[in-house]
Amino acid sequence: MIEIKNLGKVFTEKSGKVVALRNASATINDGDIFGVIGMSGAGKSTLLRCLCLLEKPSEGQILLNGRDLAALSGADLRSARRQMGVVFQGYNLLMQKTVAENVAFPLKLDKYDKAAVDARVKELLELVGLADRAGSYPSQLSGGQKQRVALARALASNPQVLLCDEPTSALDPLTTKSVLELLKDINQKLGVTIIIITHELAVVRSICNRMVVIDNGRFVEQGETAEIFENPQSEVARLLLGKEEV
């Protein structure tokens, strides 16, 4: 279980302080596919960077199974990061490395032996449907295939949580459908909790069982996806869903 408690993030810039997250609280249950949706600049990407500890929250807590991740440092922080796989927007693949080498990269950083690395890479490429592209380079892949490599790499260390930043934003409708089906498969087969940051309503509706709407750094509405789509309570949710009052 992930508990976000009163999370805040303030950036200091030359022009002054920018509040990116404000008193954000939510509970994400084990096995959820949890959607975070909002307009551009709402705070979605900052939330993801705080969740995976690339940004230190200014205040509040991020609890993973009761452990406050925001309070960790050093070896404890590195260990906690292994529990969260991240798929960044734009894939972030190593262009001079093969598909297999990209997936193996985090395992080699953790000093797994070659046999263990090879076995895990083989397993993951089979899972994402790219067993026949192990020796290919990213430049030889389609957008959907690159996303599958990014997913396999994010799963390399057996994380409890998979964070996906706009995982379908650059994909055509058919490829989007196949990637979402893969995410469902990963969730069901591996029991991984998935958090999807997106601006695409169709993505949330088709795959997320629970969701939160974020606006100006605040969580303005959250709950069961079907209920929010059927009867949005906040002005922002109604606007996003095309149900604003006339």
Residue ranges and their predicted role:
Residues I2, G8-N216, V220-E221, T225:
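ABC family nucleotide-binding domain
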Residues A226-V246:
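C-terminal boundary and immediately downstream tail of ABC-type ATPase nucleotide-binding domains
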